[in-house]
């Protein structure tokens, strides 16, 4: 199986051409045309414009991935003790690390990290197609952040970008992290970018 599904087409243009392209691509790969993480407004539009053509199911296995932003930003409580430990190790190794929003001035460094991240996994032939398409998607998202209404942040340590995160609002109350990349060999890098991105979004959009 190539993947579990695809995302709902972005933008405000007509849906039919985009859905036709997704359906043709799925047929080429011999997999069902499945869209994931459909929001209520997206479902309403699909039902309105394509009545009876889509079946909708709850994905209960994915519910664990919806978190309260305060929980991610503050990491309080016993259950998150291990995450705090990872961050403590990171702080010890990189006492002068900093978080920066992704801008035109530093986006090239994020692209460099993505290329290094993908190159380190290049030998995995079984997942080569998925890895390639993911890399293309990340690069496109970084280049088109403004057009896609995405927000991004990065972690800089020892004058090098070692982690970044990209996401967007799917509803006024829900921010979806689309991509989160870090050097896995650096303990705490993923945990720190996850926490700092949550803090950044919470501070920028307090309502």
What are these language model-derived features?
Residues 140-204:
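Glycine/small-residue-rich hydrophobic helix-like segments
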């Amino acid at each position: 199986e190539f993947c579990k599904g695809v995302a709902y087409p972005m933008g405000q243009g007509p849906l039919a051409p985009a859905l036709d392209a997704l359906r043709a691509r799925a047929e080429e790969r011999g997999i069902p045309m499945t869209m994931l993480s459909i929001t209520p407004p997206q479902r309403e539009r699909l039902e309105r414009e394509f009545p009876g053509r889509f079946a909708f199911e709850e994905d209960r296995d994915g519910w664990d991935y919806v978190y309260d932003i305060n929980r991610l930003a503050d990491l309080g409580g016993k259950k998150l003790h291990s995450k705090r430990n990872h961050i403590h190790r990171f702080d010890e190794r990189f006492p002068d690390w900093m978080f920066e929003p992704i801008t035109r001035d530093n986006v090239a460094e994020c692209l460099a990290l993505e290329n290094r991240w993908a190159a380190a996994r290049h030998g995995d032939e079984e997942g080569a197609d998925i890895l390639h398409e993911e890399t293309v998607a990340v690069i496109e998202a970084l280049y088109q952040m403004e057009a896609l209404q995405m927000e991004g942040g990065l972690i800089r340590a020892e004058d090098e970008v070692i982690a970044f995160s990209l996401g967007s609002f799917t509803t006024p109350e829900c921010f979806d992290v689309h991509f989160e990349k870090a050097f896995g060999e650096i303990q705490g890098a993923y945990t720190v970018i996850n926490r700092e991105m949550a803090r950044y979004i919470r501070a920028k959009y307090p309502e």
